[in-house]
Each structure stands twice: as structure tokens, then as C-alpha cells.
């Protein structure tokens, strides 16, 4: 297969997947922090379980996709599958998950929906994404460098 065609096809598939993902985030209202917070607020008596459909849809695609992946030697548009090699739940994972969950619970935003929410042009979303990026940079400069 021609290398240019292969690169163009990979780019096109990534673009289509990103467009589909972003459209789905907006359509399901995952980019609406109030909707997300009402989903996370189970104990309030005003819990909105509608985002369970988002989770259910993700699982309905992921399970067959993972079963197919186990049968394939390599993906169609890459040299290998990029799967996590770390399988241990350690203090970093637990602590990072707690920080992530705290931020998600306080703001109703997590990375994918926050980036998709940039389309709204809201200052609070711009500030959130800038702070999120700063947090990732700080992590890379402090934590990753201290481990190497």
C-alpha cells in the first residue's frame, strides 16, 4: 500500500472518529457540567441517570472491539496495538484517580468533554482547559522526571 495513501487513510479515520466522538459528547450533553453533576449527585434525591446510556453505549462498542482485538495480530492502520503494559493498581493510580474524581465532581468536566466544550467559547471552560494543561505539564516536569 502506498505510504501517502496509508497516512491519509489513518488521518481520515482519526478525523472521523474524533468528529463522531465530539458530536456524541455534545448530543448526550456530556459537555454540560450541570448534566454531569446531576448524574454524579446520586444522594441528592434529584439524580439524573441519563448518562448511564453513554456508559452503556461505550461498553456495547468496547466489549466486541476488545474481543476482535484479541483475534487480530495487528490493527488495520497501525503496526501494533497500543495497550497499557502496567496492570498493577499502585498508590499513584489511586491518588491520581482521587484527584481526577475530585476535579470531575467539583466541576462536572473531564478532559474529553472539556476539550469539546471549547466550542462554546465560555471563559470558564477556557480557564479549565488551560489549568488542566498546566496540571499535565507540571506532572510531566515533576513526577515523570523524578521517576527517570
UniProtKB/Swiss-Prot annotation:
One of its GO terms (cellular component) is plasma membrane. Induction: Repressed by BigR. Its main location: membrane. The chain crosses the membrane at residues 11-31, 48-68, 93-113, 118-138. The keyword Transport applies. It is found in: Cell inner membrane. It is a multi-pass membrane protein. InterPro entries: DUF6691. Keywords: Cell inner membrane, Cell membrane, Membrane, Transmembrane, Transmembrane helix, Transport. Probably part of an operon that comprises bigR, blh, PD_1892 and PD_1894. Belongs to the TsuA/YedE (TC 9.B.102) family. This is Probable transporter PD_1893. It comes from Xylella fastidiosa (strain Temecula1 / ATCC 700964).
Amino acid at each position: 500500500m502506498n505510504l501517502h495513501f496509508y497516512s491519509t487513510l489513518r488521518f481520515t479515520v482519526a478525523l472521523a472518529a474524533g468528529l463522531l466522538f465530539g458530536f456524541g459528547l455534545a448530543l448526550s450533553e456530556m459537555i454540560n457540567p450541570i448534566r454531569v453533576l446531576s448524574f454524579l449527585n446520586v444522594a441528592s434525591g434529584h439524580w439524573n441517570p441519563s448518562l448511564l446510556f453513554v456508559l452503556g453505549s461505550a461498553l456495547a462498542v468496547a466489549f466486541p472491539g476488545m474481543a476482535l482485538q484479541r483475534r487480530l495480530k495487528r490493527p488495520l492502520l497501525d503496526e501494533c496495538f497500543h495497550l497499557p503494559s502496567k496492570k498493577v493498581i499502585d498508590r499513584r493510580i489511586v491518588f491520581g484517580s482521587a484527584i481526577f474524581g475530585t476535579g470531575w465532581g467539583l466541576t462536572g468536566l473531564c478532559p474529553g468533554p472539556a476539550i469539546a466544550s471549547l466550542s462554546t467559547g465560555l471563559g470558564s471552560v477556557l480557564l479549565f482547559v488551560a489549568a488542566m494543561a498546566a496540571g499535565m505539564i507540571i506532572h510531566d516536569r515533576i513526577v515523570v522526571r523524578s521517576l527517570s
